[in-house]
């Protein structure tokens, strides 16, 4: 009888201790989460009123929040450590307020996350462009070397197929030509475009010939900015990040972007297109030839657009080195290959 009582008491005590420990852990977790949320609200609230990275850095120093700058081509990105939890903070570039519709970005970003294609984004303020995403531990952006490997490209195709055939629909259409008009309207010195090269009149004329390229195409959700840095690999799972330019488009536009931005070899580019066409059941000789022609047109138009984009940014004091020249050279090279 005594043995039975001891066993019962031990069981009761274990149950009580487990309950107490669970309660303590819940209380601790709630306290930590509250602390994290308070810090996030403070940081985001400050950044909304200030687009100067140096002032944000000073604010983080003042509040003893560990951080490190991780760069970014169009925005300043900062890695934060808030109570042991890592986040990536985007300090938006003020010029981008005129270039990017943040409401579309916020909507599309959320849709992509729900589909498992994007990282968690606790904050994306549509008015200011301030964004806070969860940092993925043990993850790396894809390199140009990786993207020239068939195993990596196959994984990219799987993500593209999921994106382009998803059930959700983005609210906006991404058109290279509409974007061009917007950027050109913001360019104060128009001659910076037309006097960049003696062949600009020809380039411009050919560019506008393709304005109806998507006329009979079923537009699908697209990322539209799949540079290697926007593809994040964690173990065997691939994420597409930074949905600033996302919108409905020809799915081949995403493939064209990867070919251009990752500088794929001809073999890798052909493999990417063939694998994608196979997965979408569109791989036969005629379809492939048509797709190949459309890819070159998209690549040409992308280079023209990003050349202009760079000139707009440079007018506001940003330094992109020879990036604009490389874009223009690529456009002229493709111009000679166009059908």
UniProtKB/Swiss-Prot annotation:
Residues 4-39 are annotated as: 9 X 4 AA tandem repeats of I-N-Q-S. It holds the Pfam family Choline_kinase. There is spontaneous, high frequency switching between three discrete levels of expression (++++, +, -) of oligosaccharide epitopes. Disulfide bonds: none annotated. The keyword Membrane does not apply. This is Protein LicA. Belongs to the peptidase S49 family. The keyword Transferase does not apply. Mediates phase variation of the LOS 6A2 and 12D9 epitopes. Phase variation of H.influenza LOS epitopes expressed by LicA is determined by a translational switch. It comes from Haemophilus influenzae.
């Amino acid at each position: 009888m005594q043995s039975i009582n001891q066993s019962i008491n031990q069981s009761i005590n274990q149950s009580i201790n487990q309950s107490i420990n669970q309660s303590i852990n819940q209380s601790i977790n709630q306290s930590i989460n509250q602390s994290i949320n308070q810090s996030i609200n403070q940081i985001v609230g400050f950044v909304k009123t200030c687009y100067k990275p140096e002032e944000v850095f000073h604010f983080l120093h003042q509040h003893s929040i560990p951080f490190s700058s991780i760069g970014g081509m169009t925005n300043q990105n900062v890695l934060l450590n808030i109570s042991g939890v890592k986040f990536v903070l985007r300090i938006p570039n003020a010029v981008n307020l005129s270039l990017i519709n943040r409401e579309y970005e916020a909507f599309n970003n959320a849709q992509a996350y729900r589909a498992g294609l994007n990282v968690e984004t606790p904050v994306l303020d549509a008015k200011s462009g301030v964004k806070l995403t969860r940092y993925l531990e043990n993850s790396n952006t894809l390199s140009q070397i990786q993207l020239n490997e068939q195993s990596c490209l196959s994984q990219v195709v799987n993500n593209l197929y999921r994106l382009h055939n998803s059930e959700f629909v983005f609210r906006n259409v991404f058109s290279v030509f509409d974007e061009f008009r917007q950027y050109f309207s913001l360019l104060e010195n128009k001659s910076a475009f037309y006097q960049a090269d003696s062949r600009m009149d020809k380039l411009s004329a050919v560019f506008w010939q393709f304005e109806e390229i998507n006329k009979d195409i079923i537009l699908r959700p697209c990322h539209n900015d799949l540079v290697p840095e926007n593809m994040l690999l964690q173990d065997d799972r691939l994420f597409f990040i930074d949905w600033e330019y996302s919108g409905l488009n020809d799915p081949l536009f995403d493939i064209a972007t990867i070919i251009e931005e990752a500088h794929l070899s001809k073999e890798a580019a052909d493999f990417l297109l063939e694998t994608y066409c196979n997965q979408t059941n569109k791989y036969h000789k005629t379809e492939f030839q048509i797709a190949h022609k459309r890819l070159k047109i998209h690549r040409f138009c992308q280079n023209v657009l990003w050349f202009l984009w760079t000139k707009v940014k440079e007018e506001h004091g940003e330094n992109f080195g020879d990036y604009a020249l490389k874009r223009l050279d690529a456009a002229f090279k493709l111009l000679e290959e166009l059908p």
